[in-house]
Amino acid sequence: CLRNKKAQASNVRHLEEESNKMHAQRLIQEVDGKCAVVNPPYPPMTTEELDASFDLPYTRVPHPKYKGKRIPAYEMIKFSVNIHRGCFGGCAFCTISAHQGKFITCRSKESIIKEVKKVIEMPDFKGYLSDLGGPSANMYGMHGRNPKACEKCKRPSCIHPQICPNLDTDHSKLIDLYRAVDALPGIKKSFIGSGVRYDLLLHKSKDEKANQAAREYTRELI
């Protein structure tokens, strides 16, 4: 990368492109007479698999080695709940494609509610969730209408330079989730600390139901 920045950029492009595919290829690069092998990522998790990983008996507290010290990063996320995995934004500065991919896997509403109830029981919880989000705040429940098209897609982003016509941008499931969480006894207010993709909100879909849900989500957010 020091000798040839264009070659390095080309190399990274190949890595990013394969990371964003539904069915990636194995990458092999010769280095000093040997071969570096990058195996394809696992397929996106199912909702059941994601629920199982979040339903494990986590303590929600820092490692004992910190011995009660204040950890700023922990303070920021200790009353937050992750609702999905993956992001189809494709931002050039972001590495989510390398470790989560662009295909969204959502937790079930039941799994999320179960975790929120555990947060409510935390001794220093005052009723305010700091974040009900994910890699991006408002991609929950979104996917390609035609999965076969997604399987062949090589685009790094589903929304740039324009929103893919195959993308279902309906925010209805997310609105329903927010309201279910806010209705729980012990919750005074839930905040959205993750980044909101406003291009999804401003998008004019051919589906009027999705347009109405985007307007409703914007009001809910404000």
What do the predicted segments below correspond to?
Residues 67-95, 113, 128:
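N-terminal pre-triad scaffold of radical SAM enzymes
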Residues 78, 82, 103-107, 165-169:
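Alpha-helix capping and helix-loop boundary segments enriched in small/acidic/polar residues
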Residues 90, 97-101, 193-201:
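Conserved strand-turn element in the central/C-terminal portion of the radical SAM core barrel
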Residues 118-222:
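Conserved SAM/AdoMet-binding glycine-rich loop
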Residues 1-77:
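Flexible, acidic/Gly-rich N-terminal and inter-domain linker regions that tether
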